[in-house]
């Protein structure tokens, strides 16, 4: 890697760190942009570098989001009551509960989709061409249909994630809505 590449990468990193302060009205859009960059990178690795036309990446992304949110809530509150309450009950995480739950959820969200990807990959990586593409597309569609029927994670309504706690009287902007789909 030459000197100009390093300067470019450092410039992008610095811009990414200061952009929320320079453009405060666009914090959510910038965070969504970062998520989409990660998804595009997974597509590039599989579709470009490896030569596989895969459409199932979103399965692992969604599985990780739902697992992280479910573990974060389920550690301290009954998950079924959280998703069924529809705003009737109020559940409030303390800051320590919020961050402990998020840490545990992130670990589970990293490990379980990795194992699932390994098992699914072992089963379907022998397919080639159109067969592989159709199989991975079917996996994504099937996962959406299955998750739409599981009531404990909100089924068709989605999963409301815990709000970011107020710490020291300061209210932080919450990006937890990016972790689980809400409709």
Protein language model features and the residues they cover:
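Transmembrane alpha-helices and adjacent helix-loop boundaries
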Residues: 1-179
